[in-house]
A protein has these predicted regions:
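HAMP domain helices
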Residues: 51-52, 321-404
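Hydrophobic alpha-helical segments
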Residues: 1-337, 341-352
Length: 404
């Protein structure tokens, strides 16, 4: 064993006590400090991610409102284009609604700001937002109704992708919690598709009512939409069931919002079939069918809002928890570090004091004073050495007394 330790013993024998102590202190405190730093860094990063997710949730809510306005804008532009092409006249009410939505969408886009702190993510966000502003500007400037529809269709597709971009940049889509990812997927991947299908049915049905006839093109489109809604009903139902299974409290929190949104995929096709496809004549105002189907679309939006409220609650609780964990970790690590430094320093001072005291006593003994005694205050090996020294001095004193 001694041969194994010989290199270290040789090194220590070359160093003074202070140098030995300093070397051991460096080898102990540097790794400890690095470890504490990374523990605190990890806790802070988790706190920051949660805060960005909360900020991203507010931004996602704004993008949902934007998407709803863009969807309504797209529907009204389609209806307006078909009415103009079939009747040759314009509706001042439609024009005013479209103009109001254009102003609202423009203001909403300009108010959006990225939640991420990453420069590359900010550039991507700003580029996508500016692209949508350019699309809106082009749509507003387009005088041909069908040309306007094409621009708004691109804007509508971009609004869907924009929500996905926000969920990715704010870490909601990559969250470590499976339940939170499930909820995010529900409002990013499913409810937008449901709302888009219902909105397409709303626009096509209202346009047919507006031109007072259902031509073959519209009839074919409605048949296709009804088939898509039937498929979506099954897929959407499975997604909702899976979400409820993974997040048991989801059913209680959402209440009837999920069932209402799912039921709309059944009730709207029946409504369209009865009032548009199978109707003997289309005499009702287009606004009536638009409002009726719009109620089904609103059910999906209400589900989005309910899920967003749940996410807001979960992330707010997590943010408080992460902040408390970070503070407790900082306090605990600091306390441990300070206690170690305090005890380490006390050990150094105690050892130095014992060695100095022993040296002083030995100096007096060397001067001939055999009456001195080393007062050992420590109970360690130095204390034992002091007791041995006292015994040796006592024996020497006895020998001197015998000789005398």
């Amino acid at each position: 064993m001694k041969s194994l330790l010989y290199p270290a013993i040789a090194l220590m024998n070359r160093l003074s006590f202070g140098m030995k102590f300093s070397l051991i202190s460096v080898l102990f405190f540097v790794p400890m400090g690095v470890t504490n730093f990374y523990l605190l860094k990890q806790a802070y990063e988790e706190f920051q991610v949660t805060r960005i997710e909360l900020q991203g949730l507010d931004l996602l809510s704004q993008s949902f409102k934007l998407r709803q306005d863009v969807q309504s804008y797209y529907d009204l532009v389609q209806i307006n284009a078909i009415i103009i092409s079939s009747t040759g006249g314009r509706s001042s009410e439609l024009d005013s609604q479209i103009a109001a939505l254009e102003a609202s969408i423009g203001q909403a886009l300009q108010a959006l700001s990225p939640a991420s702190n990453d420069d590359e993510a900010i550039q991507i966000f700003v580029a996508k937002r500016d692209e949508m502003l350019s699309m809106l500007k082009a749509a507003k400037a387009e005088a041909v109704p069908l040309g306007k529809v094409e621009f708004v269709e691109k804007l509508q597709s971009s609004s869907l992708l924009f929500s996905k971009l926000i969920s990715t940049q704010s870490y909601l889509a990559q969250d470590a919690d499976v339940e939170l990812r499930q909820l995010t997927e529900l409002i990013i991947a499913y409810t937008p598709r449901v709302a888009a299908l219902l909105s397409d049915a709303r626009a096509t049905s209202a346009a047919a009512m507006g031109q007072k006839m259902l031509d073959s093109g519209m009839a074919g489109k409605l048949d296709m939409l009804m088939g898509d809604m039937e498929k979506m009903h099954a897929e959407y139902g499975l997604a909702l069931d899976e979400a409820v299974q993974r997040v048991p409290k989801l059913a209680e929190v959402l209440g009837s919002s999920a069932n209402d949104s799912l039921a709309a995929l059944k009730s709207i096709p029946e409504l369209v079939d009865g009032q548009v496809i199978m109707a003997a004549e289309l005499v009702a105002p287009w606004k009536d069918i638009y409002a009726l189907i719009g109620e089904g679309v609103e059910k999906s939006y209400r589900l989005d809002a309910a899920v967003m409220d749940l996410l807001q609650s979960e992330l707010s609780e997590r943010l408080i928890s992460k902040r408390n964990q970070m503070i407790l970790l900082l306090v605990a690590l600091s306390a441990v570090f300070l206690i170690i430094v305090y005890l380490y320093g006390a050990f150094y001072v105690s050892t130095r004091s014992s060695l100095k005291g022993l040296g002083t006593i030995m100096h007096k003994v060397a001067g001939g004073d055999m009456t001195v005694r080393f007062d050992a205050k420590s109970q360690d090996e130095l204390g034992e050495l002091g007791e041995v020294f006292n015994g040796s001095v006592a024996q020497i004193r006895q020998l001197i007394e015998r000789v005398g």
